[in-house]
């Protein structure tokens, strides 16, 4: 069947901001799909609200709209563009839900827009719990006994009938939002009440819990001619009961017999055929370990997180093929782009094992609820490839970047057996490390299998790692054993610890005996056919398949797993840097460990090494490739942290050099440089212990801002008001980086702004100045940023430009640099300088039309700004107003306080652009799911420091028709000032406290601030978490509330009596 000629223009819906459960995998899928459709000659219109993505680059689609993904905006774009068809299956749950909304509102029918890939009935059958149940019955596929409920009472009735535990799954939600396992009525009542609110159709499925079964996934493809195949099978290390996004996953499946594999494979193919999906689909099944009985858990009728993993694990480009199937091409028409000779109808065969480990945000949120269940909590993931399970598991552990280089966590050897077992029984994000510790203490794998229901096969692999550790201790400097340990994935560092030496000596020993890794190709066909892909992984075997090319090469280090503080923005910069390296005539080589991203798509670079970003692994690749140099600027803190070791090893670092990186990161050197350059900064000192810290704070005067040096995303940063708080900070937080001292600065409450600059060493281009809406003290990644600035005087802007130039030249910056300023009484202070690409690069590149990472790379490779046609200084401003707004994932993270402060908490971002500030703000709020109606009730619960400021806000809210409610102290203050408000009980005042009113839907927004003391007030935290659970807009910074007020005021007419 040929591709369709009756459609010319296709609209693709992106997945919006990155939240837990929906991360960079959709940027990868969307980019692949848009390029595939363009390749086939279609006109592509893309809509997405997330500027930090490659898919929203102008080259990816014919027309790109960065607008809110709401019914109002998407239907306007549809009316304007009049596409023939809509492809919603590449935008995750957001894309599917948008297609459903457009269809239900009658817009698709009115405009004659056809849905491609998955029909509405298939989306309904897979997503609507009732229809799914019916379809499975018709197919004779077993599913756990279940009932759809729309009330809490019905849920309790059904649970009593089948017995606890039961699982709750709300319909049409993402990443298991609102779901959970309930072992009694009390828990069930809470979860269902919340789940019904979160489900857009007010439905929950209550089903028998099959926790403890093996969880298996199949990634399947089908075309319009009913050809179907399995691209990849995957097995979760953790049994059913833990969300697959939070599970350790191996591909292909490891513990299934041939019969079991065929059974589940056939079921998956039957399901995709019954749903008539044209494209990709993910089927999750539960297998009873003791019999051949299985259950179908769920079906995702779209490209998903697992498809990104399956694509990278096999090399088979699922999203690209799915997009082509959607326009009528068949699997047996399309060549497999990996081999270039076999067809896409060919099922991939793997001669290696892949491990995926989730990356959790609990290094940032130490107080968060770490227990795992059916609701996803990981922000990102890493993947590692090896010939053996032990090898890929240990490589994946090193890739996580949580300070471990082995399946071993510092400090676990000192905990009691009781505590150890408690951690193993209750699955947490770090259970793998507790299991490994138990095996080191001599627990048997049978005991652990009994406690966890994890298959003995996997536990035996962990035991084998422990046995190798013991052998290494017994036989120091045994070369045969060294080879054995390397084959099973041990790092030089771990072997060095066991042999009581250092990693450098192990490296020398390995090289002396020629114990070196070889690189194998990922080729989809287990080396049966010749392959064209330059996609490699390391292993300790004989034949090396990665041949150094004749061309001079440059290696770019990626940024590893997505976590809070280091998101998809850095991947964006990496991909752009590669484009510039290729344009300059070099071979571009990427090293990265994240399966979700565009940078690890093998068609992006000339060579891709899927490896942990550690010194050992990076050096191995450098020794093989002998590149011109390595670029670290675009890999976030991950890459910058390797600068020192690489420089010492004699590796040429391209761009800003180590001593200049140090000058920006090392406190004393930085102060000295600023003095020499005549640039003011807030008074500050360094301290290495509690006594020094107290002395420093007394000299500077409270409040002070304290933080460790060399960190990203404001990790462990706090505003401290008094000596007691400082003592407790020094006790708990300084473990963040022991070799580096703690920085103590005077905290200046002023306006914050930031600049990204690009320098060639002689002249400096400043694409734009971004002004933050929230005042200093809120992390820049959590602030709304406005470009061009709206409230900075010409004099202040000139000063910012002058200081930026002085810093870039003074610190010998070649490439990118990010500087943050605070402004108080027209005085400009520098708060920090990062000599690398920052998270604002994609946003600024989009709004100024300067491909910043590409320009920076060209300068790093020796060109000048003048060569590229750019002037020195500030680039002319755009005529539109653009806003970058943060998006948070608090709804997924129980017990994490949503109060904004100097530690970053947002997971993603959106952009709003329009002719006026108010319109741009409106779009940014809509895109970040902060919708406020034009009237309603708003609650004020305000700290003493902010009451007079809040009074002005309350009066303005009242003037546009909002009813004002306030807690006791705030209401009393308002009354004294002549403003009436309705008193509301804080917590525990039964039917009239804030959580109760929130549950009844009687509150439309809450403004809750905490004084500079930032005392952890239990009440405030409960109010904040209730607002998040109920999806009610919550403002913890008055400046954000003022911004929202501007929007509401601009939308309402004033009514005054004459």
Curated annotation (Swiss-Prot):
Mn(2+) 4 binds at residues 832, 834. Its cofactor is Mg(2+); Mn(2+). ATP 1 binds at residues 129, 169, 175-176, 208, 210, 215, 241-243, 284, 298. PROSITE patterns: ATP_GRASP (PS50975), CPSASE_1 (PS00866), CPSASE_2 (PS00867), MGS (PS51855). It holds the Pfam family CPSase_L_D2. InterPro entries: ATP-grasp (IPR011761), ATP_grasp_subdomain_1 (IPR013815), CarbamoylP_synth_lsu (IPR006275), CarbamoylP_synth_lsu_oligo (IPR005480), CarbamoylP_synth_lsu_oligo_sf (IPR036897), CbamoylP_synth_lsu-like_ATP-bd (IPR005479), CbamoylP_synth_lsu_CPSase_dom (IPR005483), MGS-like_dom (IPR011607). ATP 2 binds at residues 707, 746, 748, 752, 777-780, 820, 832. Mn(2+) 2 binds at residues 298, 300. HAMAP family: CPSase_L_chain_A, CPSase_L_chain_B. Composed of two chains; the small (or glutamine) chain promotes the hydrolysis of glutamine to ammonia, which is used by the large (or ammonia) chain to synthesize carbamoyl phosphate. Tetramer of heterodimers (alpha,beta)4. Belongs to the CarB family. The large subunit is composed of 2 ATP-grasp domains that are involved in binding the 2 ATP molecules needed for carbamoyl phosphate synthesis. The N-terminal ATP-grasp domain (referred to as the carboxyphosphate synthetic component) catalyzes the ATP-dependent phosphorylation of hydrogencarbonate to carboxyphosphate and the subsequent nucleophilic attack by ammonia to form a carbamate intermediate. This is Carbamoyl phosphate synthase large chain. It comes from Streptococcus equi subsp. equi (strain 4047).
